[in-house]
Protein backbone atom coordinates (compact mmCIF):
# COMPACT_ATOMS: atom_id res chain seq x y z
CA UNK A 1 0.00 0.00 0.00
CA UNK A 2 1.33 3.42 -0.95
CA UNK A 3 0.81 6.13 1.62
CA UNK A 4 -0.17 9.62 0.52
CA UNK A 5 3.14 10.96 1.87
CA UNK A 6 5.26 8.48 -0.12
CA UNK A 7 7.74 9.86 -2.61
CA UNK A 8 8.38 7.88 -5.78
CA UNK A 9 11.91 7.79 -7.15
CA UNK A 10 13.70 6.24 -10.11
CA UNK A 11 17.44 5.72 -10.28
CA UNK A 12 19.63 4.09 -12.92
CA UNK A 13 23.29 3.11 -13.13
CA UNK A 14 25.38 1.11 -15.58
CA UNK A 15 27.72 -1.44 -14.05
CA UNK A 16 30.71 -2.75 -15.99
CA UNK A 17 31.68 -6.31 -15.14
CA UNK A 18 35.01 -7.66 -16.38
CA UNK A 19 34.81 -11.35 -17.24
CA UNK A 20 37.67 -13.75 -17.74
CA UNK A 21 35.97 -15.86 -20.35
CA UNK A 22 33.28 -18.46 -19.78
CA UNK A 23 32.16 -18.17 -16.16
CA UNK A 24 29.45 -17.03 -13.76
CA UNK A 25 29.90 -13.82 -11.75
CA UNK A 26 27.85 -13.16 -8.61
CA UNK A 27 27.34 -9.41 -8.43
CA UNK A 28 24.70 -9.07 -5.68
CA UNK A 29 26.86 -6.62 -3.76
CA UNK A 30 27.18 -4.28 -6.76
CA UNK A 31 23.43 -4.32 -7.34
CA UNK A 32 22.76 -3.76 -3.63
CA UNK A 33 25.10 -0.75 -3.69
CA UNK A 34 22.98 0.78 -6.49
CA UNK A 35 19.79 0.11 -4.50
CA UNK A 36 21.27 1.78 -1.42
CA UNK A 37 22.49 4.74 -3.48
CA UNK A 38 18.96 5.17 -4.87
CA UNK A 39 17.40 5.57 -1.43
CA UNK A 40 14.43 3.40 -2.47
CA UNK A 41 12.99 1.43 0.47
CA UNK A 42 10.13 -0.42 -1.24
CA UNK A 43 10.07 -1.06 -4.96
CA UNK A 44 11.56 -3.00 -7.81
CA UNK A 45 15.07 -3.44 -9.16
CA UNK A 46 15.42 -4.38 -12.82
CA UNK A 47 18.78 -5.68 -14.02
CA UNK A 48 19.48 -5.90 -17.78
CA UNK A 49 22.60 -7.11 -19.61
CA UNK A 50 23.33 -5.20 -22.84
CA UNK A 51 24.78 -8.12 -24.79
CA UNK A 52 23.63 -11.09 -26.85
CA UNK A 53 26.32 -13.55 -25.77
CA UNK A 54 25.99 -13.15 -22.00
CA UNK A 55 22.97 -13.57 -19.74
CA UNK A 56 21.63 -13.13 -16.23
CA UNK A 57 20.34 -15.80 -13.88
CA UNK A 58 19.22 -15.99 -10.28
CA UNK A 59 20.65 -19.17 -8.84
CA UNK A 60 22.03 -20.76 -5.68
CA UNK A 61 25.04 -18.88 -4.32
CA UNK A 62 26.15 -21.29 -1.58
CA UNK A 63 27.28 -24.49 -3.31
CA UNK A 64 29.60 -23.89 -6.30
CA UNK A 65 28.73 -27.36 -7.62
CA UNK A 66 25.34 -25.98 -8.70
CA UNK A 67 27.03 -23.52 -11.06
CA UNK A 68 29.47 -26.17 -12.28
CA UNK A 69 26.59 -28.53 -13.05
CA UNK A 70 24.72 -25.77 -14.91
CA UNK A 71 27.80 -24.99 -17.01
CA UNK A 72 28.30 -28.68 -17.84
CA UNK A 73 24.62 -29.09 -18.75
CA UNK A 74 24.66 -26.09 -21.11
CA UNK A 75 27.95 -27.23 -22.68
CA UNK A 76 26.28 -30.55 -23.53
CA UNK A 77 23.00 -28.95 -24.61
CA UNK A 78 24.70 -26.36 -26.86
CA UNK A 79 28.09 -27.71 -27.95
CA UNK A 80 30.75 -25.47 -29.46
CA UNK A 81 31.00 -27.31 -32.72
CA UNK A 82 31.67 -25.01 -35.66
CA UNK A 83 30.15 -27.48 -38.12
CA UNK A 84 26.68 -27.08 -36.55
CA UNK A 85 26.24 -23.34 -37.05
CA UNK A 86 26.37 -20.91 -39.97
CA UNK A 87 27.18 -17.84 -37.87
CA UNK A 88 30.86 -17.99 -36.94
CA UNK A 89 32.12 -14.50 -37.85
CA UNK A 90 33.33 -13.79 -34.31
CA UNK A 91 34.58 -17.30 -33.57
CA UNK A 92 33.30 -20.83 -33.07
CA UNK A 93 32.04 -19.98 -29.57
CA UNK A 94 29.88 -17.06 -30.76
CA UNK A 95 26.74 -18.82 -32.05
CA UNK A 96 26.64 -21.23 -29.08
CA UNK A 97 26.90 -18.15 -26.82
CA UNK A 98 23.90 -16.57 -28.59
CA UNK A 99 21.87 -19.77 -28.15
CA UNK A 100 22.78 -20.05 -24.44
CA UNK A 101 21.77 -16.43 -23.96
CA UNK A 102 18.45 -17.07 -25.73
CA UNK A 103 17.76 -20.05 -23.45
CA UNK A 104 18.41 -18.06 -20.28
CA UNK A 105 17.57 -14.38 -19.60
CA UNK A 106 18.85 -10.92 -20.37
CA UNK A 107 16.95 -9.33 -17.47
CA UNK A 108 15.81 -10.05 -13.93
CA UNK A 109 13.35 -8.22 -11.68
CA UNK A 110 13.96 -8.27 -7.93
CA UNK A 111 11.70 -6.75 -5.27
CA UNK A 112 13.21 -4.19 -2.91
CA UNK A 113 12.16 -4.74 0.70
CA UNK A 114 13.27 -2.32 3.42
CA UNK A 115 15.98 -0.91 1.14
CA UNK A 116 17.48 -4.32 0.32
CA UNK A 117 17.21 -6.80 -2.52
CA UNK A 118 14.41 -9.22 -1.67
CA UNK A 119 16.44 -12.31 -2.55
CA UNK A 120 16.15 -15.58 -0.67
CA UNK A 121 18.94 -16.83 1.58
CA UNK A 122 20.60 -18.96 -1.11
CA UNK A 123 19.89 -16.77 -4.13
CA UNK A 124 22.52 -14.86 -6.06
CA UNK A 125 22.28 -12.76 -9.21
CA UNK A 126 24.86 -13.95 -11.72
CA UNK A 127 26.19 -12.57 -14.97
CA UNK A 128 26.86 -15.61 -17.13
CA UNK A 129 29.63 -15.03 -19.67
CA UNK A 130 29.09 -17.46 -22.55
CA UNK A 131 32.17 -16.50 -24.60
CA UNK A 132 35.66 -17.94 -24.13
CA UNK A 133 37.50 -14.61 -24.27
CA UNK A 134 37.41 -11.95 -21.54
CA UNK A 135 34.87 -9.16 -22.06
CA UNK A 136 33.71 -5.95 -20.42
CA UNK A 137 29.97 -6.49 -19.94
CA UNK A 138 27.55 -3.65 -19.28
CA UNK A 139 24.61 -4.23 -16.97
CA UNK A 140 21.93 -1.58 -16.49
CA UNK A 141 20.45 -1.48 -12.99
CA UNK A 142 17.15 0.43 -12.77
CA UNK A 143 15.59 1.02 -9.35
CA UNK A 144 12.11 2.45 -8.83
CA UNK A 145 9.87 2.77 -5.83
CA UNK A 146 9.11 4.58 -2.59
CA UNK A 147 11.80 6.38 -0.62
Curated annotation (Swiss-Prot):
It comes from Synechocystis sp. (strain ATCC 27184 / PCC 6803 / Kazusa). InterPro entries: UPF0047_YjbQ-like (IPR001602), YjbQ-like_sf (IPR035917). This is UPF0047 protein sll1880. PANTHER family: UNCHARACTERIZED PROTEIN YJBQ-RELATED, UPF0047 PROTEIN C4A8.02C. Pfam families: UPF0047. Belongs to the UPF0047 family.
